[in-house]
Amino acid sequence: MSVLRWIVPALLCLALVACGPPKKSVFPPTVTVQQLTVLPGGQWQLTVRIQNNSYSSMDFSVLEGSMQVAELMPIRLHASFTRDIPAFAGDVIQLDVLPTAAMTQTLQAVAAKGSRGSLAYRIGGSARAQPEQEDTPRDFDFSGRDWLSPVPGMPGTFR
């Protein structure tokens, strides 16, 4: 009988613990340049895609990083914004950056090749986000490499 006095309360406690909400896994986002547009003043407008790879929505607020084009000196990326991105979904932000003269020349050389041209880039940094089940935001590191190519019929646009 004394064993039952221990087993019943222990089973009730375990049942209550099991009733809590399941913890959703959180993973770093993927950040890529979806489009680069050369503006009339020589600035570049980047359309940056943030892909939430987590099982819960995340509130993104800051992007800090750098972008390196064709092994040239990297340029700083910084943006403050508000985006609530659902689980396994993505959204875009716009960033205006001022490229170096060498970056501009490299991009012009790629544009001159037309659809045969492509430009390697590397992006890295951190994105600040608050996962759905957490009380405070935290920084998630990201890094990636990809290529940009001229878009036929859209001068000054690369994807």
Spans of model-derived segments:
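Bacterial N-terminal signal peptides that target proteins for export
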Residues: 1-8
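C-terminal motif of bacterial Sec signal peptides marking the signal peptidase cleavage site
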Residues: 15-18
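Bacterial signal peptide processing site
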Residues: 20-23
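Post-signal-peptide N-terminal segment of Sec-exported extracytoplasmic proteins
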Residues: 26, 35-77, 129-140
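Beta-strand secondary-structure signal
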Residues: 30, 45-49, 64-66, 82, ...
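Short structured motifs
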Residues: 30-34, 46, 77-81, 106-111
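Intrinsically disordered, low-complexity Pro/Gly/Ser/Thr-rich segments with frequent PxxP/GP/PP motifs
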Residues: 70-106
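Terminal connector regions
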Residues: 101-157
